[in-house]
Amino acid sequence: MAKRVAIVGAGVSGLASIKCCLEEGLEPTCFERSDDLGGLWRFTEHVEEGRASLYKSVVSNSCKEMSCYPDFPFPEDYPNYVPNSHFLEYLRMYANQFNLLKCIQFKTKVCSVTKHEDFNTTGQWDVVTLCEGKQESAVFDAVMVCTGFLTNPYLPLDSFPGINTFKGQYFHSRQYKHPDIFKDKSVLVVGMGNSGTDIAVEASHLAKKVFLSTTGGAWVISRVFDSGYPWDMVFMTRFQNMFRNSLPTPIVNWLIAKKMNSWFNHANYGLIPEDRIQLREPVLNDELPGRIITGKVLIKPSIKEVKENSVVFNSSPEEEPIDIIVFATGYTFAFPFLDESVVKVEDGQASLYKYIFPAHLQKPTLAVIGLIKPLGSLLPTGDTQARWAVRVLKGVNKLPPSSVMIQEVNTRKENKPSGFGLCYCKALQSDYIAYIDELLTYIDAKPNMFSLLLTDPHLALTIFFGPCTPYQFRLTGPGKWEGARNAIMTQWDRTFKVTKTRIVKESPSPFASLLKLFSFLALLVAIFQIFL
């Protein structure tokens, strides 16, 4: 009899988890508290309790070739950076393609997940749900939690002296939907993550004045990177990842700073990060430098004091009149349906082995999927997490002893960044390629570069030097996708299809053959170093 798996949430990770369960012959039941799938990517005019919220203009920060599910490319006529409405439609297509809707119970809230009375023997869970006022309880062999980390706003008002005296309007960025509220107002956005920067830029088109307050600065990059290519298709390659990981940290930091400043000098715009030893993820925004240089956005340091109708910034004695304050200060996360004895969240971190499994459970029958913030898309990350997790839940793959897992979790906690402006989400960050490769190794699905070099050198070169697109993650092993090779070899065709809307003649490069030869030799050297 197939094992029954309860999946909490029908967002991007929940959908991947349903599919992975079906692939392994398990029986998934997904509980979604809202009336539709999509999670974060489903825009609504009003904020819904327990669900991530986004503003109308949100566009993906990862391009379509880097942010799709590994066995389901975006339609080729989609723009390279996908608006939220297109993204939601893509998720609907994914659910229909793999017949996932039959496994989802909508308008069903998970009230509690507790250990069954014989958990130490069976590993089973009691799941209590509420649907249209009716409460039900069922026993499941395993549970996959896919609720994400963007539902509980982090609003540290105690860090802003005088905020209680402010007579204007203030709210967390989670409440933001449209820029109309900023028309002819003086606006202050606190926090320079992607959301804070987006909101400041949007506000600057309508507001009287916009201030963007940042504690530590940030590197800002455009979606349009070298030679007009999508930033992540240039930046995120196996070759570059190996190169960065093989150099001393100061050199890597210097190289990254040089690259970041190639668009504009961050120091001249008051943006250069104060802590250049501990690199923060870059902020993606195509307009910010232009808004700053035209005086539409003013970069300010942290807030010293909030007054009735104004704000005083650190290192600046002047009071700046303010009508609206938007706190883009990030999120915390919690599992209200789980007891602390199952997953304890402390100081913004959960004791999860590889960001997935509670390290102390007697039976590895509960997995958390998507509670991670890679410098890359969550779709392929969640899919890879789910593939491994499902095989552990099924009993095909085994976890290390609890003591080993706890030690690794504790080590990660000790290395956690700290300080206001980093928020709890920083504790969830990981090295995208290295992390996914590690999980792929556990299920024997990591591409074997040496073998590919001998059997399919063209593919090997493309995988190593080209963008690390998700198709690589289902090239081999359990859940292998037969279309993976073709998707890899045609990834640039789909990228340019939506930009080359006017045909132009191109001259062939005389150096193309030499470049291919150099790439082949470089790959040989890299593989030789790996096997030394």
Curated annotation (Swiss-Prot):
The record marks K208 as: Important for substrate binding. FAD binds at G9, A10, G11, V12, S13, E32, L40, W41, N61, S62. It catalyses: hypotaurine + NADPH + O2 + H(+) = taurine + NADP(+) + H2O; hypotaurine + NADH + O2 + H(+) = taurine + NAD(+) + H2O; trimethylamine + NADPH + O2 = trimethylamine N-oxide + NADP(+) + H2O; N,N-dimethylaniline + NADPH + O2 + H(+) = N,N-dimethylaniline N-oxide + NADP(+) + H2O. Liver. It holds the Pfam family FMO-like. Residues 532 are cytoplasmic. The modification N-acetylalanine is found at A2. It is found in: Endoplasmic reticulum membrane. Coiled coil: none annotated. It is a single-pass membrane protein. SUPFAM superfamilies: FAD/NAD(P)-binding domain. Broad spectrum monooxygenase that catalyzes the oxygenation of a wide variety of nitrogen- and sulfur-containing compounds including xenobiotics. Catalyzes the S-oxygenation of hypotaurine to produce taurine, an organic osmolyte involved in cell volume regulation as well as a variety of cytoprotective and developmental processes. This is Flavin-containing monooxygenase 1. The gene is FMO1.
